[in-house]
């Protein structure tokens, strides 16, 4: 599928020596995770594991971590009250009864709450990870113990990554009819290896900008054969997950990996979309001097009005202390940029894919890689200069730290409703194209989360609703409204 190959996958290429390759895929858990290093050298694919019910329909690092993972999930549920509320409201009618959902997302305590919600609503689920470093091993174990067919562990190799996806899709006697994807790799694999599966698929729900790009490429080429829902560009994803989640998690990820002090540091953020805006706001608040690079004049003007200098990367690359990519594009930071960085410059990515930083160009004999701590590599030039590369250019927050549970509840609720909508839509409502969520659905997701803040909406009077030409119950904004 040529359309997919235009957007390289997040796993990238792994061409280092065996010793470095092993250190790059050690089964480190996230900073909040329980770890058991006794069997780190044994691949989960080589183990024979069963849960307490005797099932072996999973592949995780260590099923014995399930009890700890269950506690992590229960803690997440406390801050995901809206998703739990949706689960309770819809559990009786089972809107996903008969749904067979194959998913490829980050596997964390928060996504586990989503997966178990889908199961409670009647779906059967098979799940793999969309990022080789973001899986919380104990959470994957808890899902496996609960009967979910999950194939994921932290520190997968590239071969492991595709093997896990294949195990989810290719199972005798079970065929998916819905796809929930984050990055497009699952969709790509089905197109490439099992195109006949799409005869049964009712729809695709895609969360990330990378995956959405790939869907639009297919649609433009006339090769998208099922309806797809673009969750990434929904208001509830863009304005909450992308902005507020990144505003908090960028600092967490950088602190945990580098212990950097932000006051007075010069930072360049590539991209001033919602992710970039969140990162910049957090860095500025702690006293960092922040520069922006942008291709879009509207976003660039927003950055200027927010008090940031908009520059070309080449203008500041020699002086900055930190480089952060937030574009969803490829080769934003090239080998030329990396060669010109000053000693100890920190380089990381807050976009979905690992293609934003040209990490492949650093896999050369003249450069030495030194793993100094989990997800932190020093790339050393012949003259002794070091560049600090985080998570091998993959997503910083989920690879190196955690993300705010409440914000992920908003995204997870949106994903659940999108799956329900596509699965239950009458024939003909959605064609073979990419769709945004209906405005009413966005508003419903937001309304479910307001009680957490003890927030109370004002209600329109009949006269006010008539004056504005609105239904008193919404939607309250036209589709063209920009929040």
Curated annotation (Swiss-Prot):
It comes from the Eukaryota. InterPro entries: Adenosylhomocyst_ase-like_sf, Adenosylhomocysteinase-like, Ado_hCys_hydrolase_NAD-bd, NAD(P)-bd_dom_sf, S-Ado-L-homoCys_hydrolase_CS. Substrate binds at residues 108, 182, 207, 237, 241. Phosphorylated at Ser/Thr residues between Ser-21 and Thr-25 in the PEST region: required for interaction with dATP-bound RRM1 and ITPR1. Phosphorylation at Ser-21 by PRKD1 and CAMK4 is required for further phosphorylations by CSNK1A1. Phosphorylation is induced by oxidative stress. Probably phosphorylated by CAMK2A; phosphorylation at Ser-21 may be required for interaction with SLC9A3. Dephosphorylated in response to apoptotic stress conditions which causes translocation of both AHCYL1 and BCL2L10 from mitochondria-associated endoplasmic reticulum membranes and promotes apoptosis. One of its GO terms (cellular component) is intracellular membrane-bounded organelle. Pfam families: AdoHcyase, AdoHcyase_NAD. Residues 234-401 are annotated as: NAD binding. Residues 91-154 are annotated as: Interaction with BCL2L10. NAD(+) binds at residues 271-275, 294, 329, 350-352. CDD domains: SAHH. The modification Phosphoserine is found at residues 21, 24, 27, 30, 37, 344. Binds 1 NAD(+) per subunit. It is a peripheral membrane protein. SUPFAM superfamilies: Formate/glycerate dehydrogenase catalytic domain-like, NAD(P)-binding Rossmann-fold domains. It is found in: Endoplasmic reticulum; Cytoplasm, Cytosol; Apical cell membrane; Microsome. Its main location: endoplasmic reticulum. GO terms for biological process: angiotensin-activated signaling pathway; apoptotic process; epithelial fluid transport; mitochondrion-endoplasmic reticulum membrane tethering; one-carbon metabolic process; positive regulation of sodium ion transport; protein export from nucleus; regulation of monoatomic anion transport. The keyword Lyase does not apply. Its cofactor is NAD(+). The PEST region is essential for the interaction with ITPR1, and, when phosphorylated, is also the RRM1-binding region. The PDZ-binding region is required for maximal interaction with ITPR1 and is also responsible for the IP3-insensitive interaction with ITPR1. Belongs to the adenosylhomocysteinase family. Forms multimers. Forms heteromultimers with AHCYL2 (via the C-terminal region). Interacts (when phosphorylated) with ITPR1 (when not phosphorylated); the interaction suppresses inositol 1,4,5-trisphosphate binding to ITPR1. Interacts with BCL2L10; this strengthens the interaction of AHCYL1 with ITPR1. Interacts with CFTR and SLC26A6; the interactions take place once AHCYL1 is released from ITPR1 and increase CFTR and SLC26A6 activities. Interacts with RRM1; in a phosphorylation- and (dATP)-dependent manner. This is S-adenosylhomocysteine hydrolase-like protein 1. The gene is Ahcyl1.
